[in-house]
C-alpha cells in the first residue's frame, strides 16, 4: 500500500531486528473484521555457486478472526521469514515471496500495511527516551502526528501504559528497566496503534521463566480487552498450548505445513487443564512432529 516500515531511529527501514510500525496511508480501524491470507507462498534464495535454495514450499494459510495463532517449527525452517511476509517486511534486494501472494482484507500486501504491526524478541526501545516517549514514538512520525489530535494520542498512550502496568515508570529511561519491562514497552508501543493484526516473533524467548509467564498472562488480558488477530512465532510448545487458539507446525526446509489444529479450551488455561489428557495429547502431537524434523537443528522448549 506504499507505506513505510520505520524503526526507532525514524529511518525508513525493513530491518527485521526492530519493531516495524507502519504509516497510515489509509484509515486503520479497530474492527475485529479482518482477513489475512497466504496463497501458495514459495521463497527461494539464489546461491552464487549452485541452484537456488527453497526455504518455503507452497504454504497457504487463512486467518479471518481475532484469534491467537501459534507458529512452530524447527530452527531455521522459515517461520520468521513467513511472519515478515505477513507484515510486508521484505529483505533488501530479494524478491519476497518468490511466488504466491499475501492478502490483507482482500488487497495484495506488497509492503508494510496499515493494519499490521510487528513485535520482535529484540524490543528496540531507545535508551535516550523515557518509557512514555518510547510508547508515544509512532505519533512523532509525520503521518501519524497529522492523523491524531494531540489529546487523543496522549490519552491512548496513558491508557496503554496503565494496561501494561508501567504508569509509575513512564518518566524512567528504558535503560533503567528490566528485560520484561522493556518488552512491556514494546508491546504497548505496538498496541497503542490499535492494529487489527499483531505479528510477534518470539517476543518472550529471551525472558526468564517467571517474567515470560507474566508476559503471557498480560498478552491474554490485552487480547481479551482489545481483540486482534495475532500470529505468534515460538519454540516453546507449552507456550503454544497456553496461548493459542490455533497451532500451526512447519516442517524443515523447504517448509510445508506439517500440522494445523485448533484448541477450544478458553483462556486463561488452568494448570489442571495443562495436565489433562487433552493437553498432554496435543503436546505429544506437536513434539512428535518437531522431533521428526529437528534432529540436530536446534532446541525445542517445553516449560513445566
Would you name each region that the model predicts?
Residues 72-74:
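The feature captures the beta-strand-to-loop junction immediately N-terminal to the Walker
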Residues 87:
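Helix-to-loop junction immediately C-terminal to a conserved catalytic motif
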Residues 97-111:
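Conserved ABC transporter NBD signature motif
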Residues 129-138:
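Short coil-to-helix segment of the ABC ATPase nucleotide-binding domain corresponding to the Q-loop/switch region
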Residues 140, 148-169, 221:
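Conserved ABC ATPase "signature" region
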Residues 173-177, 181:
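Conserved ABC ATPase signature
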Residues 192-196:
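A short, proline-enriched helix->beta-strand linker immediately N-terminal to the Walker B motif
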Amino acid at each position: 500500500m506504499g507505506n513505510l516500515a520505520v524503526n526507532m531511529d525514524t529511518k525508513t527501514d525493513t530491518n527485521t531486528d526492530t519493531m516495524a510500525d507502519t504509516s497510515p496511508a489509509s484509515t486503520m480501524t479497530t474492527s475485529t473484521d479482518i482477513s489475512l491470507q497466504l496463497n501458495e507462498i514459495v521463497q527461494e534464495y539464489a546461491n552464487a555457486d549452485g541452484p537456488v535454495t527453497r526455504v518455503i514450499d507452497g504454504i497457504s494459510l487463512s486467518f479471518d478472526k481475532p484469534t491467537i495463532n501459534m507458529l512452530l517449527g524447527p530452527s531455521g525452517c522459515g517461520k520468521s521469514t513467513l511472519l515478515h511476509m505477513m507484515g510486508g517486511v521484505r529483505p533488501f534486494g530479494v524478491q519476497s515471496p518468490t511466488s504466491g501472494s499475501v492478502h490483507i482484507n482482500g488487497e495484495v500486501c506488497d509492503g508494510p500495511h496499515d493494519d499490521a504491526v510487528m513485535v520482535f524478541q529484540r524490543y528496540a526501545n531507545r535508551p535516550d527516551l523515557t518509557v512514555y516517549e518510547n510508547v508515544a514514538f509512532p505519533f512523532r512520525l509525520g503521518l501519524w502526528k497529522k492523523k491524531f489530535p494531540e489529546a487523543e494520542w496522549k490519552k491512548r498512550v496513558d491508557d496503554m501504559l496503565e494496561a501494561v502496568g508501567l504508569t509509575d515508570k513512564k518518566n524512567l529511561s528504558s535503560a533503567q528497566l528490566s528485560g520484561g519491562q522493556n518488552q512491556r514497552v514494546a508491546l504497548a508501543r505496538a498496541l497503542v496503534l490499535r492494529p487489527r493484526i499483531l505479528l510477534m516473533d518470539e517476543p518472550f524467548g529471551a525472558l526468564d521463566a517467571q517474567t515470560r509467564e507474566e508476559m503471557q498472562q498480560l498478552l491474554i488480558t490485552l487480547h481479551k480487552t482489545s481483540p486482534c488477530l495475532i500470529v505468534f512465532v515460538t519454540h516453546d510448545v507449552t507456550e503454544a498450548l497456553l496461548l493459542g487458539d490455533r497451532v500451526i507446525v512447519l516442517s524443515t526446509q523447504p517448509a510445508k505445513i506439517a500440522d494445523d489444529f485448533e484448541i477450544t479450551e478458553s483462556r486463561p488455561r488452568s494448570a489442571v487443564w495443562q495436565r489433562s489428557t487433552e493437553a498432554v495429547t496435543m503436546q505429544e502431537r506437536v513434539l512428535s512432529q518437531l522431533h521428526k524434523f529437528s534432529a540436530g537443528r536446534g532446541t525445542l522448549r517445553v516449560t513445566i
